[in-house]
Design a protein with these regions (language model features):
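Membrane-interface extramembranous regions at the lipid-water interface
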Residues: 1-95, 100, 108, 125-171, ...
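Short aromatic-rich membrane-water interface segments that cap or initiate transmembrane helices
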Residues: 109-121
Length: 211
């Protein structure tokens, strides 16, 4: 019988997955009319957390092997998507910055003026998403299940944070298009802190597992 903290983690993880799914929906609806490419890695990360939570629950409840294999395949496919899109978007942002710096008059001033918020909103989330996806791509799903048992409560909380972050990302993108940078700065600052906490928690869990 699983311990109290693992069961609590599964329950909170299920709730966090619902939050992540809600955030994913809002994010996609908003980004459909704004910047869909930059939103994809965050959305894919939300999908991954939902799949990971479902796999953990199926592992606890003893679901069929076919169901587990289907979830395993979907989860690994999503991890690959996170890594690929994250790297592509980060590369695109860097390319845009270099192009503006060297080919646009006053380009350096434009970058200093506008790009800090852009980096916080797009570069950091996609870099972190790509990093997490790349690291976990090389971890088997069995090890992921063991991680979810040992760090179930923490991972559940992280899924809730990602769900909230997805809503925040979409909201700040919308606010930027309507009200400009001043309102946007607060949102991207919160995003940067949240992503840093998310990356730190997962990397710590992986390091503890490996060493």
């Amino acid at each position: 019988m699983p311990g109290f903290w693992w069961l609590s983690g599964l329950i909170v993880g299920f709730i966090g997955s619902l939050i992540a799914a809600f955030g994913l929906t809002i994010n996609l609806l908003i980004s459909w009319f704004a910047t869909p490419i930059s939103a994809l890695p965050a959305s894919a990360l939300g999908v991954f957390l939902v799949l990971a939570s479902l796999y953990s629950m199926s592992h606890a409840l003893g679901s069929s092997v076919v169901f587990k294999q289907a979830l395993a395949g979907a989860t690994m496919w999503t991890l690959g998507l996170i890594s690929a899109i994250g790297v592509l978007v980060v590369s695109g942002v860097l390319w845009d910055m270099l192009y503006i710096m060297f080919h646009v008059k006053g380009g350096l001033y434009m970058i200093v003026e506008a790009y800090p918020s852009l980096i916080a909103a797009i570069f950091i989330p996609n870099a972190v998403a790509g990093l997490i996806g790349s690291i976990m791509w090389f971890k088997s799903l069995r090890e992921l299940a063991e991680l979810s048992q040992e760090y179930g409560f923490m991972m559940a909380g992280m899924s809730g944070l990602v769900g909230a972050l997805l809503v925040l990302t979409g909201a700040t993108l919308l606010l930027t298009s309507q009200a400009g940078i001043p309102i946007y700065i607060f949102g991207v600052a919160v995003q940067a802190v949240t992503w840093a906490l998310l990356a730190g928690a997962y990397i710590q869990a992986l390091v503890n597992e490996l060493f």
